[in-house]
């Protein structure tokens, strides 16, 4: 098991039971951020219609900033980043209704 903190900010918490922060013990099969995204879809997004708010074309939807330990995930090899104990993964929506 690996302990990670996952944050859903900028209104994204509505797709994960309106909880902004999750401290998770993820199974050892969850090796990288891509695996973590799959884990989130399977275990945290209860209404499967909300998956399209989070994912588009097998990646995080444009308009969602993804940070790994406060660093843009594009600098950390995106979905291939290997998760380590204590990592903080943040998803922040920049899109808001008006």
From Swiss-Prot:
GO molecular function list: protein homodimerization activity; protein tag activity; sulfur carrier activity
Chain positions found as 1-thioglycine: 98
Predominant subcellular localization, coarse grouping: cytoplasm
Key words of the record: Cytoplasm, Isopeptide bond, tRNA processing, Ubl conjugation pathway
Keyword Cytoplasm: yes
Domain of life of the native organism: Eukaryota
Family listed: Belongs to the URM1 family.
Name this polypeptide is given: Ubiquitin-related modifier 1
Biological source species: Candida glabrata (strain ATCC 2001 / BCRC 20586 / JCM 3761 / NBRC 0622 / NRRL Y-65 / CBS 138) (Yeast)
